[in-house]
């Protein structure tokens, strides 16, 4: 089940809900770790994945390091970064996972700020290598995840389309209508 919305920059943004086989509904933490990572890979062993995490999956810098970050609300990160170090993945009492974020020595420098595992947005290594784009992967074992997805289906319009065109020297020239759907499908 999925929905695709268009954000203000005009690019498509997908929310995808994948249903697992019933035998996978209550996994062990190790099962979650096989699918989702919230750690910086070892650059010596997984250099390509390390570079993709650096490019696409690091949150911030924000907090005291950058109070002007867009995620900052009342001097706190609205996405709750940096997360806490956790030596193993656990599922809390509400059924939400707290991903493994060990305090290893792997770091990434972004805008002159050293970031560690506490700043990694959860990802799936296979999807990140294949699509080379930001893909926030979350383990959901709740009915609320279906409600979350339907919120986006029924969310109404919140988009802008802009186009830069050469200026018309003749102000009386008839402008041709713009077929935005065709432009999107042709790109």
What residue ranges belong to the model's regions?
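Extended, structured polyanion-binding interfaces
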Residues: 1-187
């Amino acid at each position: 089940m999925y929905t695709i919305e268009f954000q203000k920059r005009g690019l498509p943004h997908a929310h995808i809900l994948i249903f697992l086989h019933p035998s996978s509904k209550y996994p062990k933490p190790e099962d979650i770790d096989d699918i989702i990572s919230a750690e910086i890979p070892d650059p010596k062993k997984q250099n390509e994945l390390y570079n993709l995490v650096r490019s696409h999956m690091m949150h911030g810098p924000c907090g005291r390091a950058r109070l002007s970050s867009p995620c900052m609300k009342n001097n706190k990160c609205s996405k709750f970064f940096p997360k806490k170090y956790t030596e193993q993945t656990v599922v809390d009492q509400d059924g939400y996972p707290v991903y493994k974020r060990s305090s290893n020595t792997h770091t990434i420098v972004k805008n002159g700020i050293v970031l560690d595992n506490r700043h990694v947005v959860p990802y799936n290594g296979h999807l990140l290598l294949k699509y080379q784009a930001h893909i926030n992967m979350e383990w959901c074992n709740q009915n609320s995840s279906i409600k979350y997805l339907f919120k986006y289906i029924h969310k109404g319009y919140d988009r802008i389309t802009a186009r830069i065109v050469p200026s018309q020297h003749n102000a009386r020239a008839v402008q041709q209508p713009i077929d935005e759907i065709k432009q999107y499908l042709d790109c």
